[in-house]
Structure formats: C-alpha cells, structure tokens
Amino acid sequence: MPASKFLIASCSAVLLWAAVLGPHFARPARADETCNSPYLSTLIRGKEDYLYVWTLGVAGMGDGFDKLVTLDVRPGSRTYGKVIAQASVGERGEAHHVGFTDDRRFLWAGGLDSNKIHVFDVGANPAHPRLVRTITDLGARSGLHGPHTFYALPGRMLIGALSNAADGGGVTGLALYNNQGEYIRKYAMPVDSGGDGYGYDIAINPARNAMLTSSFTGRKNYMRDLGALIQDPAAMQRFGNTMVMWNLKAMRPEKVFAVPGAPLEIRWSLREGDDWAITSTALTSKLWLIKKDAAGQWQARPVADIGDPAKTPLPVDMSISADSKGLWVNTFMDGTTRYFDISNPEAPKQTYAKKTGAQVNMVSQSWDGKRVYVSSSLLARWDKRGKDNEQFVKLYGWNGKELT
C-alpha cells in the first residue's frame, strides 16, 4: 500500500505515542501493538480499526490544548485516514505517553509538565473516546513528577515517572494507582548499589518474575531548549546510565545494570520460553541485550550500534515484532526508521532503513507486522525549528523488504 500521511489539522499535530489498538468488545477483530502489558485482559491479534493519538497542544492550532485524537484506519471506510474524534483536556501540559488499563476500557495519558494524568473512556465508544477523569495528586501523594509510562497490572496501573516534585531532577520512582484513579503507594528508584535513581520505561515478564526499568532525565532537562541543553556540559551529565531488574512479586530492586547513555524503551521477547529483553541508548546509539548468563544471572551488554554513534542519531521509540525476530527503531535527529534482524539477539543486524521524516519519534506495528505507523515530534522544546518541525502520522505497508 502507499504510505499514508494523516495530518491532524484542527488540533496539535504533535504525536508522542501511537496506539494501533481497539478494545476487544467493539468488534471481533482487533489488534494489539506488541509493547502492551501482558496483563491486558485479552491480547487481541487481528486488524486495527482506530489509531489513538495523544497530541501536544500548539498555540493557535484548534483550541491550542492537548487532546486525544482518533484516526480511522479501516481501509474502505469513507473516513479512512481522517480524524473522526477529538477529546481535549483544556490545557497544555506536555502530552507524551499513554497506556491501557488491564480491562482495556480506559486509556491513561500523562502530561510531563503539568504532572496530571488524564483518563479517557475508550470502551463505551471506541471511535469517540471521552475524558472522564483527571488525576492531579501524583506530586502531592508520591513526590514524583512527569508521569511517563503507564503499565497495566491486574486492577491497577503502575506509572513510571521521569522526575520529582522537589527539585525537578532525575531522581524519581514508580507510583501505583488502582483503576479507579486512587493512589496506593510509591516505589523509589534505587540510589545505592550503583543505582542513579533515574527512571523512564517499565517492562514486565511475569513468567520470570522480572520487571525491568530504564532511565532518562528530569524535568530541568526535558523542559529545556535542546540546543541550550546540549551546550551545557553539567546538564548533559544529568542523564540516566542504568537499568534495574526488579523482583516483580516483591516489587524490590534486585540488580542495577550499568547501561551508559540513557537507556529508553524496553521490549521483552514475546516468544514463549525466551528470557531476554532489548533496549536502546539515546546518547550512545546502541542496542543492549538483557539476558541470563550461563550461571543464571541477569546481565546487560551492548550488542549493536544504531546508525553512526559519532553522529548521535538519537534512537527513541522501538517496536518488536510478534515473533521477536524483528525490531523497528526510530532515530530522531536523522529522521530514519530502521529495521533490525534480531533472530539472534546476541548479534542484531540492521537490514533496512528509510528516512521517514525530519524528526521521527514513535513507531508502532500491527500484530501481523504488515502495517507500521510512524509519527513525528519528541518534546515541545526539543523539536526542530522551521520546515523541519514536521508534525504527522504516517502509515506504511511492510512486505518484509521495504516500507511502502
């Protein structure tokens, strides 16, 4: 199929997370993006109907506020490729990531600046999500700031924050809420045994009683102009360089891995029996493998470069295939979408690359791997200027050899 460019004209075109999903009770055939929590009530493997886009408000565009936008991605539909619904939150708060509750009825969406969590009902009418709740007590109850990752647990939501409410630095933690939006408790990121206290993503492998977290940077950095940040040596030292393996049942840190260069997204292999995960480092442009060694101990080590690390392509989002043999990686600075053959995770090989924009960030694929969604924009003050400040969502077909 030809690449389709879905522009969001009546609201912010900044896309920071793409969900190629639809709740299972709307129609029999639905699809899951492969990064979803394993605790979703049904991991549905079909064809997606709607694309949920959590967009960043831009002054002078629509109402100027952050909003959840719904795109129709049903081929043959008269509204295919068009915005069919918008749910505004009435403010700008640095919209970023979202995540489903385990029952798939609600989508939680965070503001990295506002520190608010907006809850949308996507179950009652999947084509027209509705804002039903805004959670405002994250800072007061947990001391955390910048809700980033929303990871479904049975009846609960585990939230990975980027910063703290005290000094805006990178020392942070995890907050646990129930599905009704009630705060339960906080888990601090470790600052001993080699830990730096930083946080970013969450990924769980229930079969191994294993939870991995990664690390990025605090509000002082992510809300700063990128050009000025890069020119500040002290600020550039304030990025995470660790990952943490947690005992899932005990919710206790068990091992800190040294992973220099801000490890971001984490993807566990989806093949039954596998015991490895993969991540990428934003500042050093490497793929890292987390796997047990011959002695049964978890270890982390670099296994491949992403582009030319000397040019800092800045890998951001990634998407693992359902058979865990392929990995899509977007690099922000050079606007490239790359495909790695990871059939041997010890030695990933880049087999394809395509420039898909000036500043690409998010990448999501359908469960069957035949459709790949790419979007632009990273953070409001990190995005490029002028003509390179592209705001889009693109749908590509993937035939195993090229994006079309």
Predicted regions and their residues:
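Blade-loop segments of beta-propeller domains
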Residues: 80-149
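Loop/turn-rich, solvent-exposed surfaces of beta-rich toroidal or solenoidal domains
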Residues: 310-387, 393
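Short loop/turn segments immediately following beta-strands, especially the blade-tip
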Residues: 71-78, 119-129, 180-182, 289-299, ...
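Beta-propeller domains
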Residues: 101, 194-343
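Surface-exposed loop and turn segments in beta-propeller and other repeat-based domains
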Residues: 82-94, 132-143, 186-197, 253-262, ...
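Short, conserved, GDST-rich strand-edge loop motifs in beta-rich repeat architectures
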Residues: 46, 52-63, 160-170, 214-238, ...
